[in-house]
Regions:
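N-terminal Rossmann-like NAD(P)+-binding domain of SDR-like oxidoreductases, especially those catalyzing
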Residues: 1-110
């Protein structure tokens, strides 16, 4: 997998940042899609393109990627009890949007 163009959803979060570091070390071109609800701009890595957007709007991205790592999610338990509809919107509807976009554009999802 040499020099692939890779999209990382949730790329400004803890796991996303560490994955992006590894992908860059391997020589890949990386784009991060994150709405910064929990990710931080301070986590940005040089040479990575960052898109500040919700995963539900992924359909507007040009589908010229080789691979997508889907890490965007609301993972904290307590907020899921406080606002289950938001958790469903992000974790279920958002994941479906990513999967549909990847399928239409013939992009592998990890």
């Amino acid at each position: 997998m040499i020099n692939k163009k890779i999209l990382v959803t949730g790329g400004a979060g803890f796991i996303g940042v560490n994955l992006i570091k590894r992908l860059k070390e391997e020589g890949h071109r990386v784009v991060s899609l994150d709405n910064y609800d929990s990710g931080l701009e301070a986590n940005h890595i040089e040479g990575v393109k960052y898109i500040n957007a919700d995963i539900e709007t992924i359909e507007y991205l040009k589908g010229d990627y080789d691979l997508v790592y889907h890490l965007a999610a609301l993972s904290r338990i307590q907020p899921s009890f406080e606002d289950p509809s938001e958790t469903y919107r992000v974790n279920v509807t958002g994941t479906r949007a990513v999967a549909d976009w990847a399928r239409v554009n013939n992009i592998k999802v990890v």
